[in-house]
Swiss-Prot record:
Listed name of the protein: Lysine--tRNA ligase
Family matches, as Gene3D superfamilies: Bira Bifunctional Protein, Domain 2 (3.30.930.10), Nucleic acid-binding proteins (2.40.50.140)
Organism listed in the record: Nitrosomonas europaea (strain ATCC 19718 / CIP 103999 / KCTC 2705 / NBRC 14298)
GO biological process, one term: lysyl-tRNA aminoacylation
Catalytic activity line of the entry: tRNA(Lys) + L-lysine + ATP = L-lysyl-tRNA(Lys) + AMP + diphosphate
Keywords per UniProt: Aminoacyl-tRNA synthetase, ATP-binding, Cytoplasm, Ligase, Magnesium, Metal-binding, Nucleotide-binding, Protein biosynthesis
Residues binding Mg(2+) 2: 419
Lineage: Bacteria, Pseudomonadati, Pseudomonadota, Betaproteobacteria, Nitrosomonadales
GO MF terms held by the record: ATP binding; lysine-tRNA ligase activity; magnesium ion binding; tRNA binding
Entry's localization field: Cytoplasm
Gene name for this UniProt entry: lysS
GO cellular component terms attached to this protein's record: cytosol
Subunit structure comment from the entry: Homodimer.
InterPro entries listed in its UniProt record: Aa-tRNA-synt_II, aa-tRNA-synth_II, aa-tRNA-synth_II/BPL/LPL, Lys-tRNA-ligase_II, Lys-tRNA-ligase_II_N, Lys-tRNA-synth_II_C, NA-bd_OB-fold, NA-bd_OB_tRNA
Length: 502
């Protein structure tokens, strides 16, 4: 008995590719090398669910005939009979190919098939002596000839970067990767259902903006040839969604891509997926409650539990999320600071400079506190916590607090040491918004590349009247990281941005 595992051990890969191309040439000479007339009627997972519990005798008596298709991952040739395992979108199933049932000609052809080839198989279900559900093949079809050998031993790609560059190979060989992206799809579907059930309307807004807005970030710039004008890939859909609220669409949401021309890290990808949703006649406190409910419901639908293990630490989303100001969070995790120090501009400036942080001379106390929070505390926030009362100077689109105009009715949600969501009561005073845009424009002129542009059309929309509104953005990729226990954002984006290969 001989056993073929993965090619590429004893021969150079180029020789293997040449050998497979030779087989493809022979196939072309005999007819259609890439047929498209085979139709399966079952998936591996469904067959296992239906028939794994059946005995050998039950299967033999019922003579269940099925048609399956998938990529061949294992192949074992033994004289007058052979075994193979194929993988489809749902799982794997074993094939039994023999002279008696499949025919000598088809069995002989199978001997020359390679791992990675895509097969269609028709036959009768049975169980082997080891009780493995298998298909006794009566007809075998080579649907696609694979010209390149798969990674050795199907242990997946050893090089992490190659997993990202050649995600198709990672998906073929790594069940965990397939699981992550199946969960991602379920998360997005669960979010949609949560919002639609509450009468939110899903909308689509432009991906190319004449003026970048809705966030403080550097945009990607492109050019429209026919209009001879610069356009920006959107950094956020916020200003368009609020235009819709002005127009009477009082509960809207969008799940789509944002683009920011900034750094790449385990938490950042230049192209990422964001949920943004807006509701008229509500405020930021309502949004915090709604967000807690949303995350619990999504976790239950996706995982069946609100208990999450992330990087070997456990949390329970069923517990109430804490709410802390920026200063309270710093003091909780850094008792070496005092409240007086956190309200001392000179102290904050020196503390930040000591940590190598460049201090903006125009920053107020709130901005300096936030910089210290980002540097010292953000990464320590494992349990879900809403950080509230963001300073007005860093919140150009948020409504100022009625009792203290130095802060805004804004929050950010942190889980597992990273920001998951950002929301606030929306600024709907057009004159206040215009003044804040002017401040941002001055900052941009002074060299702040992330400052916002002045958007006159948005101001005009506000002048028609934006009702009291609350809005929020949730980073889908980071939420998927949390619910799949993935350490890097690249693990949850099918094709993350990477440097160009040499």
């Amino acid at each position: 008995m001989t056993q073929e595992e993965i090619s590429g051990i004893s021969q150079d890969e180029n020789n293997l590719i040449a050998e497979r191309r030779s087989k493809l040439t022979a196939l072309r000479q005999t007819g259609n090398a890439f047929p498209n007339d085979y139709r399966r009627d079952n998936l591996a997972r469904i067959l296992h669910e239906k028939y794994d519990s059946c005995s050998r005798e039950e299967l033999e008596s019922s003579q269940v005939t099925v048609k399956v298709a998938g990529r061949m991952l294992f192949k074992r040739v033994m004289g007058k009979a052979s075994f193979a395992t194929i993988q489809d979108m749902s799982g794997r199933i074993q094939l039994y190919i023999s002279n008696d049932h499949t025919g000598e000609t088809a069995h002989e052809a199978f001997r020359h098939y390679d791992l990675g080839d895509i097969l269609g198989a028709e036959g009768v279900l049975f169980k082997t002596r080891t009780d493995e559900l298998s298909l006794r093949v009566t007809q075998l079809h080579l649907l696609t000839k694979s010209l390149r050998p798969l990674p050795e031993k199907f242990h997946g790609l050893a090089d992490q970067e190659q997993k990202y560059r050649r995600r198709y190979l990672d998906l073929i060989t790594n069940e965990d990767t397939r699981r992550v992206f199946a969960i991602r799809s379920k998360i997005i579907q669960a979010i949609r259902e949560f919002l639609v059930d509450r009468d939110y309307l899903e909308v689509e807004t432009p991906m190319m903006h004449s003026i970048p807005g809705g966030a403080t970030a550097r945009p990607f710039v492109t050019h429209h040839n026919a209009l001879d004008m610069s356009l920006y890939l959107r950094i956020a859909p916020e200003l368009y969604l609020k235009r819709l609220v002005v127009g009477g669409m009082e509960k809207v949401f969008e799940i789509n891509r944002n683009f920011r021309n900034e750094g790449i890290s385990t938490r950042h990808n230049p192209e990422f997926t964001m949920l943004e949703f807006y509701e008229a006649y509500q405020d930021h406190n309502y949004l915090m409650d709604l967000t807690e409910s949303m995350l619990r419901e999504v976790a239950l639908k996706v995982s069946g539990t609100t208990r999450i293990v992330y990087q070997q630490r456990e949390m329970d989303l069923a517990q109430p999320f804490a709410r802390l100001t920026i200063a309270q969070a710093i003091l909780k995790y850094h008792p070496e600071y005092s409240d007086a120090q956190l309200n001392d501009r000179d102290f904050l400036t020196k503390a930040l400079q000591a940590k190598g942080v460049t201090v903006n001379p125009d920053s107020g106390i709130g901005g300096l506190q936030l910089a210290l929070f980002d540097e010292t505390t953000e990464h320590l926030l494992f349990e879900p916590v809403f950080i509230v009362d963001y300073p007005a100077e860093v919140s150009p689109l948020a409504r100022c607090n009625d009792a203290n105009p130095e802060i805004t009715d804004r929050f950010e949600l942190y889980i597992a040491g990273r920001e998951i969501a950002n929301g606030f009561s929306e600024l709907n005073d057009p004159e206040d918004q215009a003044n804040r845009f002017l401040e941002q424009a001055r900052a941009k002129e002074a060299g702040d590349l992330e400052a916002m542009h002045y958007d006159a059309d948005y101001i005009q929309a506000l002048e028609y009247g934006l009702p009291p509104t609350a809005g929020e953005g949730i980073g889908i990729d980071r939420l998927v990281m949390l619910l799949t226990d993935s350490p890097s954002i690249r693990d949850v984006i099918l094709f993350p941005q990477l440097r160009k290969e040499d």
